[in-house]
């Protein structure tokens, strides 16, 4: 078997390792942020860290092992990656509104962010 016929175990190792580190850090900072204070702002940031970490985990799987997956599996993993990154950005927007409104969230803001997310998808 020649060198060109061998399949790599991980196809994009640096990108995958970076994504896996982001997953670990996202989980750590998510847990840490949730334990800080009992506020809506910190709750939203904690959720955002967890969601971004999970998106990074899926991105690392896709970048590292994606060529071994079927076309459908690749699309599903990448779609879920983008969904989790989008949810994370919406959480950050929501935390901004919570900060501006003295730790409270208006239903109108949630509806606007929901439709904004639908445009993203």
Model-derived features: where do they sit?
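Juxtamembrane/transmembrane-helix boundary motifs in multi-pass membrane proteins
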Residues: 6-10, 38-39, 73-74
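Long, amphipathic alpha-helical coiled-coil segments characteristic
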Residues: 17-37
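Hydrophobic alpha-helical transmembrane segments of multi-pass membrane proteins
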Residues: 18-22, 44-66, 88
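Membrane-interfacial loop-to-transmembrane alpha-helix junctions, especially the N-terminal start
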Residues: 38-52, 103-112
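Aromatic-anchored segments of alpha-helical transmembrane domains
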Residues: 54-55, 113-121
